[in-house]
Amino acid sequence: MPKTPNVPGTDRPAEKAAGHWLLAQLGKKVLRPGGRETTNWLLSRALGGQIDVVEFAPGLGITALEIVKRSPKTYTGVDLDPKAAEIVRGRIGDNPNYTVVNAGAQETGLPDSSYDVVVGEAMLTMQTDKHKLEIMREAARILR
């Protein structure tokens, strides 16, 4: 398989790569159930005013860029993959209120009751039922 530059997981053989990174290597860089239109519709209703937003598993930062264009008070991306976290940092620009942490969505290390909105586009579908529950509990913990 040809390697796509700047895509995490390119150091692993296809049979060992995470499904979303394998799709990214093949050119499918955004996983959006419902498509871009649905994502934009949801973001336009969820993101308004001075709110604090956390995004679980921002991947290559495509949705992160859409979020920061809406000027939230803060944006925090949480990605387990260090290369993905670095890519998202590059996309969101140099704003002290916009950060990316290298952590898992089930244990972010973020403070309790500190965010207004959690975004996690298509990331739960790739998790076991146990991990889905852990991620949802973490989201509930960090939401106000």
What are these regions (language model features)?
Residues 54, 60-107:
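Class I SAM-dependent methyltransferase SAM/SAH-binding core
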Residues 106-118:
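A short acidic, Gly/Pro-enriched loop at the edge of an enzyme's catalytic core
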Residues 117-130:
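A short SAM/SAH-binding and catalytic strip from SAM-dependent methyltransferases
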Residues 17-36:
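Class I SAM-dependent methyltransferase Rossmann-like catalytic core
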Residues 133-144:
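A short glycine-rich, Lys/Arg-flanked "PGG" loop and its adjoining helix->strand segment in the class I
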Residues 1-22:
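N-terminal, positively charged/glycine-rich alpha-helical extensions of SAM-dependent methyltransferases
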Residues 46-47, 92, 143-144:
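A generic alpha-to-beta junction signature in SAM-dependent methyltransferases
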